[in-house]
Amino acid sequence: MKINELRTPCYVIDEGKLTENLLILNGVMRRTGARILLAQKAFSAFYEYPLIGRYLSGTTASGLFEARLAHEEMGKENHVFCPAFLPQEMDELVEICDHIVFNSVSQYLLHRDKIEKADKKISVGLRINPECSTQEGHEIYDPCAPGSRLGITREALDKAIKNGLDLSRIDGFHFHTLCEQDSDALETTLAAVEEKFGDLLYGLKWLNMGGGHHITRADYDIERLEKCIMHMRDKYDLEIYLEPGEAVALDAGYLETTVLDIVENNGIKILILDTSAACHMPDVLEMPYRPPLMDSGEPGEKKYTYRLSSCTCLAGDVIGDYSFDREIKTGDRLCFCDMAIYSMVKNNTFNGMPLPDIAVMDENKDCKVIRRFEYEDFKCRLS
């Protein structure tokens, strides 16, 4: 089956591009000795976990459910971080995770006994806040913004040490401060980490540099990244971890959709699609951003310009304005690009919108549907 034969709406995972990304990441691992983990919050299509596991060291989770998924479907290194863990969650996490990272000293102290009494050795980390913002235009995703709840500042850590925290029981530090950024932002962040926490790094076993590294983007400076990794590895004798999410499946997915109707208002021709920004690609409204669309241009660039929208009742459920060389008609199919990341993991059934099917496309461009969602999937989430 080819992509234009799939029922719409449908997410399509491009296994050829996914493999290209994994080869790039695996190359960084081989050259630097770093361990790279899939951040499941961006991409949790576990059908592909056997493929991903052939190239990466494992996964990182944002809570119990993701950690369970990784344990069941990949079975490699299993890391977890959450701003706060429930006591009953920790009972299971100590059985299935290798690394557990805490957001605060109080969380570590609350769960310390369960970790130390676990049947296996759990590597314990603390998330630090280097108080170094490098983002522009993504404030909602900036963990170093003033008043952030994420990570421990040096001031807070010093206070905890003064009050009796035994750092010798902590194996590593974790920071996650980037979002879709190049390695120059990592270099800047590492300078802040060394300035604020460098004296404490010598006593640790590992440093996790988090995610937000757009390593597989065409213009990403991999050489600088590798220098950063080796600098921290060699200076402090640390094992280095990276946990990208987007970089694993960047440009490795599509969202195939059909034009249901065309309406006009104030001279604007509006395409009503069987997909939705609010339901199927929430980051379009949350960031916001205009997703790439195959065979299209900027508004006015090509002969025919349309506004792309949805069949939900939300007035603001608008994807963006695009232009085309040809006139679009009801029944035509359109294809959004870069739809593997932060799509399937964030979609919802607001307004009773059906969830898109999920398909995989092999290197011969042949597609196979691996999941279909029907009415019962909508109903089972309600009561």
Q: What do the predicted segments below correspond to?
A:
Residues E92, D113-K114, T134-I140, A185, ...:
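Short acidic, glycine/serine/threonine-rich loops at helix termini
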Residues E187-A192, D221-K227, T257, S323:
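Charged helix-capping and loop-helix junction motifs
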Residues C132-T134, C179, I215, V248, ...:
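Feature marks short, surface-exposed loop/turn motifs that line or immediately flank catalytic pockets
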Residues A39, T177-L178, L207-T216, P244-E246:
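Glycine-rich beta-strand-to-loop/alpha-helix junction loops that act as flexible
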Residues C228, E239-S383:
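Charged (often Lys/Glu-rich) extended helix/loop segments that serve as interaction or gating elements
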Residues A34-W206, C228-H231:
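Active-site-proximal beta-alpha core segment in soluble small-molecule metabolic enzymes
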Residues M1-G75, F81-A84, E89, S276, ...:
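N-terminal capping/small domains of soluble enzymes
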